[in-house]
């Protein structure tokens, strides 16, 4: 089965809901839908599209044809900001390293374009013609990856903790625990944040605070692991972490993180988990993550 659908020329939220209904009817309830924002109506109705979707793709090629190209940069920034505030992943795509279809090295402007999308908060950058039909597909992938790694290294050293709009005042327990975990990990110098998760939701929330250490996430569901690949800073692993108790689950997750090399004996990690006996219910919804745990690895 597939993991994602990138839906072209989405104009409103209803179109996303129709795609989701088709997925569910055909056994694809875990398929994530990324509408491609590439027309004027998609921009105009963006808020309802974002509400209905699992993430967004900024498809700048057609968008720059459908609307004035000089409007694309600030629309891109606004879309990324809104996705960050909604804790939903965003992909920036099209013509990022376009000259590498014919040349082994990008222009400096293209390098800056990729880096600036990452500075703005994009979760992923995507190649299209460069890797699909270009003369240097492998070189293009390696170049984009190297730009991303260097940019993230700079952000880890210089950028402050990112707090999406409303996150510091929200009373949603999942968000509060996620932000607290990142604050603790940053303050104590933790080597990683360890996240046992069923659906990947907690990893997604923590991802959007942009911590400067890896988010080591474990799920027993392959579909959840595949989805978490798209989240900024998350290193997802397929593993049966859940034990009979919350403490047992946390200890198993930390031990697995140690085995994978994310944290060594004597170093610190912060783990999140959910204790179902004390889950907080508000407005008819359960907050599944209600524990943040500091541990020194043995």
Language-model-detected regions and their locations in the chain:
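Non-catalytic helical/linker scaffolds that mediate oligomerization, partner binding
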Residues: 1-298
């Amino acid at each position: 089965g597939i993991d994602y659908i990138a839906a072209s020329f989405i104009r409103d939220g209803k179109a996303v809901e129709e795609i989701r209904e088709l997925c569910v009817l055909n056994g694809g309830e875990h398929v994530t839908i990324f509408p491609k924002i590439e027309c004027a109506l998609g921009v105009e109705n963006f808020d309802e599209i974002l509400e209905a979707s699992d993430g967004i793709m900024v498809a700048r090629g057609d968008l720059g044809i459908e609307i004035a190209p000089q409007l694309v940069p600030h629309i891109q920034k606004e879309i990324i900001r809104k996705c960050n505030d909604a804790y939903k992943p965003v992909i920036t795509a099209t013509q990022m390293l376009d000259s590498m279809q014919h040349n082994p090295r990008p222009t400096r402007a293209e390098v800056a374009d990729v880096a600036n999308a990452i500075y703005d908060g994009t979760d992923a950058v995507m190649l299209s013609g460069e890797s699909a039909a270009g003369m240097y597909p492998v070189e293009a992938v390696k170049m984009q990856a190297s730009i991303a790694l260097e940019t993230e290294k700079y952000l880890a050293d210089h950028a402050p903790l990112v707090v999406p709009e409303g996150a510091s005042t929200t009373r949603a327990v999942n968000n509060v625990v996620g932000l607290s975990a990142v604050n603790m990990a940053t303050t104590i110098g933790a080597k990683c944040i360890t996240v046992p998760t069923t659906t990947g939701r907690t990893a997604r929330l923590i991802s959007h605070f942009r911590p400067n250490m890896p988010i080591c996430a474990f799920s027993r569901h392959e579909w959840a692991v595949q989805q978490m690949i798209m989240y900024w800073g998350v290193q997802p692993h397929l593993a049966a972490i859940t034990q009979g108790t919350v403490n047992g689950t946390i200890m198993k997750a930390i031990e697995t993180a140690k085995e994978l090399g994310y944290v060594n004996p004597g170093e610190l990690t912060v783990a999140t988990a959910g204790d179902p006996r004390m889950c907080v219910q508000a407005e008819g919804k359960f907050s599944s993550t209600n524990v943040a745990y500091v541990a020194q690895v043995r």
